[in-house]
Protein backbone atom coordinates (compact mmCIF):
# COMPACT_ATOMS: atom_id res chain seq x y z
CA UNK A 1 0.00 0.00 0.00
CA UNK A 2 1.21 3.49 -0.87
CA UNK A 3 1.44 5.78 2.17
CA UNK A 4 1.31 9.33 0.76
CA UNK A 5 3.33 12.14 2.35
CA UNK A 6 1.00 14.98 3.29
CA UNK A 7 1.34 18.66 4.12
CA UNK A 8 -1.33 20.79 5.80
CA UNK A 9 -1.77 24.49 5.00
CA UNK A 10 -3.78 26.21 7.74
CA UNK A 11 -3.72 24.84 11.28
CA UNK A 12 -7.22 25.95 12.34
CA UNK A 13 -10.12 23.71 13.38
CA UNK A 14 -10.08 21.47 10.32
CA UNK A 15 -6.29 21.53 9.88
CA UNK A 16 -5.73 20.29 13.43
CA UNK A 17 -8.53 17.72 13.35
CA UNK A 18 -7.24 16.42 9.99
CA UNK A 19 -3.84 16.09 11.70
CA UNK A 20 -5.32 14.12 14.61
CA UNK A 21 -7.21 11.85 12.23
CA UNK A 22 -4.08 11.25 10.18
CA UNK A 23 -2.24 10.03 13.28
CA UNK A 24 -5.11 7.59 13.99
CA UNK A 25 -5.56 6.58 10.35
CA UNK A 26 -1.99 5.44 9.56
CA UNK A 27 -2.85 5.43 5.86
CA UNK A 28 -1.13 8.78 5.34
CA UNK A 29 2.06 10.37 6.64
CA UNK A 30 1.94 14.02 7.78
CA UNK A 31 5.37 15.53 7.12
CA UNK A 32 4.78 19.32 7.15
CA UNK A 33 2.41 22.03 8.36
CA UNK A 34 2.21 25.67 7.26
CA UNK A 35 0.49 28.48 9.15
CA UNK A 36 1.75 32.09 9.07
CA UNK A 37 -0.44 33.22 11.96
CA UNK A 38 0.76 30.94 14.77
CA UNK A 39 4.24 30.04 16.01
CA UNK A 40 5.35 26.46 16.41
CA UNK A 41 5.12 26.38 20.23
CA UNK A 42 1.54 27.68 20.06
CA UNK A 43 0.70 25.15 17.32
CA UNK A 44 1.94 22.41 19.67
CA UNK A 45 -0.32 23.70 22.46
CA UNK A 46 -3.37 23.91 20.17
CA UNK A 47 -2.77 20.38 18.91
CA UNK A 48 -2.31 19.03 22.43
CA UNK A 49 -5.44 20.54 23.99
CA UNK A 50 -8.89 20.75 22.42
CA UNK A 51 -12.09 21.88 24.15
CA UNK A 52 -14.28 19.71 21.90
CA UNK A 53 -12.23 16.57 21.28
CA UNK A 54 -10.13 16.47 24.43
CA UNK A 55 -6.40 16.05 24.95
CA UNK A 56 -4.26 14.63 22.16
CA UNK A 57 -3.70 10.92 22.71
CA UNK A 58 0.09 10.95 22.52
CA UNK A 59 3.06 13.27 22.96
CA UNK A 60 3.37 16.73 21.40
CA UNK A 61 6.63 18.70 21.62
CA UNK A 62 8.52 21.25 19.53
CA UNK A 63 12.11 22.11 18.71
CA UNK A 64 12.99 25.17 16.64
CA UNK A 65 10.68 25.10 13.61
CA UNK A 66 9.73 21.48 14.11
CA UNK A 67 6.70 19.84 15.70
CA UNK A 68 7.53 16.51 17.34
CA UNK A 69 4.45 14.29 17.60
CA UNK A 70 4.81 10.83 19.15
CA UNK A 71 8.54 11.22 18.52
CA UNK A 72 8.09 12.00 14.81
CA UNK A 73 9.46 15.28 13.42
CA UNK A 74 7.11 17.43 11.34
CA UNK A 75 8.40 20.59 9.67
CA UNK A 76 6.50 23.78 10.56
CA UNK A 77 6.49 26.67 8.06
CA UNK A 78 5.04 30.18 8.34
CA UNK A 79 4.61 31.32 4.72
CA UNK A 80 1.69 33.57 3.72
CA UNK A 81 2.03 32.85 -0.01
CA UNK A 82 1.17 29.24 -0.94
CA UNK A 83 3.68 29.41 -3.81
CA UNK A 84 6.49 30.00 -1.30
CA UNK A 85 5.89 26.94 0.89
CA UNK A 86 8.76 24.50 0.19
CA UNK A 87 6.72 21.30 0.28
CA UNK A 88 9.39 19.48 -1.73
CA UNK A 89 11.83 19.82 1.22
CA UNK A 90 9.81 17.26 3.14
CA UNK A 91 8.51 15.28 0.16
CA UNK A 92 4.90 16.39 0.78
CA UNK A 93 3.15 15.49 -2.48
CA UNK A 94 -0.44 15.85 -1.22
CA UNK A 95 -1.42 19.14 0.40
CA UNK A 96 -4.55 19.77 2.45
CA UNK A 97 -5.60 23.37 1.80
CA UNK A 98 -7.50 24.14 5.01
CA UNK A 99 -7.12 27.90 5.41
CA UNK A 100 -10.60 28.50 4.03
CA UNK A 101 -9.03 31.27 1.91
CA UNK A 102 -7.63 29.51 -1.16
CA UNK A 103 -10.74 27.64 -2.30
CA UNK A 104 -10.46 28.41 -6.02
CA UNK A 105 -8.34 26.52 -8.52
CA UNK A 106 -6.01 29.41 -9.34
CA UNK A 107 -4.97 30.10 -5.74
CA UNK A 108 -4.99 26.49 -4.53
CA UNK A 109 -2.78 25.42 -7.45
CA UNK A 110 -0.02 27.74 -6.17
CA UNK A 111 0.96 24.88 -3.85
CA UNK A 112 2.18 23.01 -6.93
CA UNK A 113 4.98 25.57 -7.32
CA UNK A 114 6.45 24.44 -4.00
CA UNK A 115 6.54 20.80 -5.01
CA UNK A 116 3.08 19.52 -4.18
CA UNK A 117 1.55 17.21 -6.79
CA UNK A 118 -2.07 17.29 -5.59
CA UNK A 119 -4.07 19.82 -3.56
CA UNK A 120 -7.15 18.79 -1.59
CA UNK A 121 -9.33 21.75 -0.57
CA UNK A 122 -11.16 21.11 2.71
CA UNK A 123 -14.12 23.25 1.68
CA UNK A 124 -16.49 23.56 -1.27
CA UNK A 125 -14.91 25.00 -4.42
CA UNK A 126 -16.73 26.85 -7.17
CA UNK A 127 -14.33 25.77 -9.92
CA UNK A 128 -12.57 22.57 -8.78
CA UNK A 129 -14.00 19.05 -9.02
CA UNK A 130 -15.71 17.93 -5.81
CA UNK A 131 -15.49 14.42 -4.44
CA UNK A 132 -17.50 12.80 -1.67
CA UNK A 133 -16.16 9.47 -0.44
CA UNK A 134 -18.59 6.64 -1.06
CA UNK A 135 -20.54 8.71 -3.57
CA UNK A 136 -18.39 9.80 -6.53
CA UNK A 137 -14.75 9.21 -5.57
CA UNK A 138 -14.59 6.59 -8.34
CA UNK A 139 -14.81 9.49 -10.83
CA UNK A 140 -11.34 10.71 -9.80
CA UNK A 141 -8.65 10.50 -12.49
CA UNK A 142 -4.88 10.97 -12.24
CA UNK A 143 -4.84 14.15 -14.33
CA UNK A 144 -6.77 16.11 -11.65
CA UNK A 145 -4.36 18.22 -9.59
CA UNK A 146 -6.72 20.36 -7.48
CA UNK A 147 -9.86 18.85 -5.95
CA UNK A 148 -12.36 19.62 -3.21
CA UNK A 149 -13.63 17.38 -0.42
CA UNK A 150 -16.90 19.41 -0.52
CA UNK A 151 -18.43 20.54 2.78
CA UNK A 152 -19.18 18.62 5.97
CA UNK A 153 -22.92 18.96 5.27
CA UNK A 154 -22.61 17.71 1.68
CA UNK A 155 -20.62 14.76 3.04
CA UNK A 156 -23.52 13.99 5.39
CA UNK A 157 -26.34 14.48 2.90
CA UNK A 158 -24.85 12.93 -0.26
CA UNK A 159 -24.42 9.32 0.97
CA UNK A 160 -27.98 9.30 2.34
CA UNK A 161 -29.38 10.91 -0.82
CA UNK A 162 -27.47 8.37 -2.94
CA UNK A 163 -29.01 5.40 -1.12
CA UNK A 164 -32.53 6.82 -1.29
CA UNK A 165 -32.20 7.93 -4.92
CA UNK A 166 -30.68 4.62 -6.08
CA UNK A 167 -33.37 2.56 -4.36
CA UNK A 168 -36.52 4.68 -4.58
CA UNK A 169 -35.73 7.76 -6.70
CA UNK A 170 -35.91 11.33 -5.39
CA UNK A 171 -38.32 13.61 -7.28
CA UNK A 172 -37.35 16.66 -5.21
CA UNK A 173 -36.17 17.46 -1.72
CA UNK A 174 -35.52 20.18 0.83
CA UNK A 175 -32.78 19.95 3.42
CA UNK A 176 -32.32 21.76 6.70
CA UNK A 177 -29.09 21.30 8.60
CA UNK A 178 -29.30 22.07 12.29
CA UNK A 179 -25.66 23.09 12.55
CA UNK A 180 -23.36 23.77 15.49
CA UNK A 181 -21.77 27.19 15.55
CA UNK A 182 -18.37 27.59 13.89
CA UNK A 183 -15.35 29.91 14.08
CA UNK A 184 -16.87 32.46 11.69
CA UNK A 185 -19.63 33.29 14.20
CA UNK A 186 -19.54 35.76 17.09
CA UNK A 187 -19.16 35.23 20.84
CA UNK A 188 -21.15 38.45 21.39
CA UNK A 189 -23.16 40.58 18.94
CA UNK A 190 -20.82 42.20 16.42
CA UNK A 191 -20.63 43.58 12.90
CA UNK A 192 -21.28 41.18 10.02
CA UNK A 193 -22.04 43.25 6.94
CA UNK A 194 -22.75 40.39 4.54
CA UNK A 195 -24.91 38.43 6.99
CA UNK A 196 -26.56 40.53 9.67
CA UNK A 197 -28.04 37.55 11.49
CA UNK A 198 -24.64 35.86 11.44
CA UNK A 199 -23.26 38.70 13.56
CA UNK A 200 -25.47 37.81 16.52
CA UNK A 201 -24.25 35.89 19.57
CA UNK A 202 -23.70 32.25 18.58
CA UNK A 203 -24.29 30.71 22.02
CA UNK A 204 -27.54 32.58 22.65
CA UNK A 205 -29.46 32.27 19.39
CA UNK A 206 -30.86 29.94 16.74
CA UNK A 207 -29.64 31.69 13.59
CA UNK A 208 -31.11 30.99 10.12
CA UNK A 209 -28.37 30.88 7.50
CA UNK A 210 -27.76 29.89 3.90
CA UNK A 211 -25.88 26.81 2.72
CA UNK A 212 -24.96 25.49 -0.70
CA UNK A 213 -24.59 21.95 0.65
CA UNK A 214 -27.81 20.53 -0.80
CA UNK A 215 -27.29 22.05 -4.24
CA UNK A 216 -23.72 20.69 -4.19
CA UNK A 217 -25.12 17.16 -3.96
CA UNK A 218 -26.23 17.71 -7.57
CA UNK A 219 -22.57 18.12 -8.52
CA UNK A 220 -21.53 14.79 -7.03
CA UNK A 221 -24.77 12.97 -8.00
CA UNK A 222 -25.66 14.45 -11.42
CA UNK A 223 -29.09 12.79 -11.51
CA UNK A 224 -30.06 14.95 -8.50
CA UNK A 225 -28.91 18.21 -10.05
CA UNK A 226 -31.64 20.83 -9.58
CA UNK A 227 -33.72 18.53 -7.37
CA UNK A 228 -32.33 19.52 -3.96
CA UNK A 229 -31.80 22.78 -2.10
CA UNK A 230 -31.59 23.69 1.55
CA UNK A 231 -30.86 26.02 4.41
CA UNK A 232 -29.09 26.01 7.75
CA UNK A 233 -30.06 26.78 11.32
CA UNK A 234 -26.99 27.61 13.41
CA UNK A 235 -27.62 26.51 17.00
CA UNK A 236 -25.83 26.99 20.35
CA UNK A 237 -23.82 23.75 20.37
CA UNK A 238 -20.06 23.59 19.77
CA UNK A 239 -19.96 20.47 17.60
CA UNK A 240 -22.10 17.78 15.91
CA UNK A 241 -24.84 18.74 13.48
CA UNK A 242 -27.85 17.01 11.97
CA UNK A 243 -29.37 16.93 8.49
CA UNK A 244 -33.14 16.85 8.02
CA UNK A 245 -33.99 15.77 4.47
CA UNK A 246 -37.62 16.04 3.38
CA UNK A 247 -38.06 14.27 0.05
CA UNK A 248 -40.72 13.19 -2.39
CA UNK A 249 -40.03 9.70 -3.73
CA UNK A 250 -40.64 8.34 -7.22
CA UNK A 251 -41.25 4.81 -5.98
CA UNK A 252 -43.60 4.23 -3.05
CA UNK A 253 -41.87 2.87 0.04
CA UNK A 254 -42.73 2.18 3.67
CA UNK A 255 -40.52 3.78 6.31
CA UNK A 256 -39.33 0.29 7.27
CA UNK A 257 -38.20 -0.32 3.68
CA UNK A 258 -36.24 2.94 3.74
CA UNK A 259 -34.62 1.97 7.06
CA UNK A 260 -33.66 -1.41 5.63
CA UNK A 261 -32.12 0.14 2.51
CA UNK A 262 -29.99 2.51 4.60
CA UNK A 263 -28.98 -0.25 7.04
CA UNK A 264 -27.87 -2.52 4.19
CA UNK A 265 -25.83 0.28 2.61
CA UNK A 266 -24.22 1.10 5.98
CA UNK A 267 -23.09 -2.51 6.34
CA UNK A 268 -22.12 -2.89 2.67
CA UNK A 269 -20.87 -0.43 0.03
CA UNK A 270 -21.01 2.61 2.35
CA UNK A 271 -19.52 0.98 5.43
CA UNK A 272 -17.39 3.50 7.32
CA UNK A 273 -19.03 6.42 5.52
CA UNK A 274 -22.71 5.96 6.37
CA UNK A 275 -23.65 4.86 9.87
CA UNK A 276 -26.99 3.59 11.17
CA UNK A 277 -28.48 3.74 14.64
CA UNK A 278 -31.76 2.80 16.29
CA UNK A 279 -30.59 4.11 19.67
CA UNK A 280 -32.13 7.19 21.31
CA UNK A 281 -29.08 9.35 20.65
CA UNK A 282 -28.60 13.09 21.14
CA UNK A 283 -25.97 15.25 19.49
CA UNK A 284 -23.17 14.84 22.06
CA UNK A 285 -23.33 11.05 21.64
CA UNK A 286 -21.92 11.50 18.13
CA UNK A 287 -18.94 13.65 19.14
CA UNK A 288 -15.85 12.03 17.63
CA UNK A 289 -17.83 9.71 15.33
CA UNK A 290 -15.76 9.04 12.18
CA UNK A 291 -18.73 8.49 9.82
CA UNK A 292 -19.76 11.17 7.31
CA UNK A 293 -23.40 10.54 8.13
CA UNK A 294 -25.19 8.57 10.86
CA UNK A 295 -28.80 7.75 9.95
CA UNK A 296 -31.16 8.07 12.92
CA UNK A 297 -33.82 5.43 12.24
CA UNK A 298 -36.05 6.55 15.12
CA UNK A 299 -36.01 10.27 14.30
CA UNK A 300 -37.46 10.15 10.77
CA UNK A 301 -41.13 10.12 9.79
CA UNK A 302 -43.25 9.40 6.72
CA UNK A 303 -46.39 11.33 5.83
CA UNK A 304 -47.25 8.71 3.22
CA UNK A 305 -45.40 6.21 1.04
CA UNK A 306 -44.01 8.93 -1.25
CA UNK A 307 -43.25 11.78 1.18
CA UNK A 308 -40.68 11.32 3.94
CA UNK A 309 -38.50 13.18 6.41
CA UNK A 310 -35.13 11.53 7.07
CA UNK A 311 -32.65 12.48 9.79
CA UNK A 312 -28.90 11.92 9.79
CA UNK A 313 -26.24 13.12 12.26
CA UNK A 314 -22.65 14.14 11.59
CA UNK A 315 -19.66 15.28 13.58
CA UNK A 316 -18.99 18.27 11.34
CA UNK A 317 -15.35 18.39 12.46
CA UNK A 318 -14.20 14.82 13.09
CA UNK A 319 -16.21 12.91 10.49
CA UNK A 320 -15.42 15.44 7.77
CA UNK A 321 -11.70 15.47 8.60
CA UNK A 322 -11.59 11.68 8.46
CA UNK A 323 -12.95 11.83 4.91
CA UNK A 324 -10.22 14.29 3.91
CA UNK A 325 -7.68 11.65 4.96
CA UNK A 326 -9.65 8.84 3.29
CA UNK A 327 -9.81 10.84 0.06
CA UNK A 328 -6.04 11.41 0.06
CA UNK A 329 -5.39 7.72 0.75
CA UNK A 330 -7.77 6.80 -2.07
CA UNK A 331 -6.37 9.15 -4.73
CA UNK A 332 -2.81 8.14 -3.80
CA UNK A 333 -3.68 4.52 -4.65
CA UNK A 334 -5.19 5.62 -7.98
CA UNK A 335 -2.16 7.81 -8.73
CA UNK A 336 0.19 4.90 -8.03
CA UNK A 337 -1.48 2.60 -10.58
Swiss-Prot record:
The record marks 179 as: Activates thiol group during catalysis. Pathway: Carbohydrate degradation; glycolysis; pyruvate from D-glyceraldehyde 3-phosphate: step 1/5. One of its GO terms (molecular function) is NADP binding. NAD(+) binds at residues 13-14, 35, 80, 316. CDD domains: GAPDH_I_C, GAPDH_I_N. Gene3D superfamilies: Dihydrodipicolinate Reductase, domain 2, NAD(P)-binding Rossmann-like Domain. Belongs to the glyceraldehyde-3-phosphate dehydrogenase family. This is Glyceraldehyde-3-phosphate dehydrogenase.
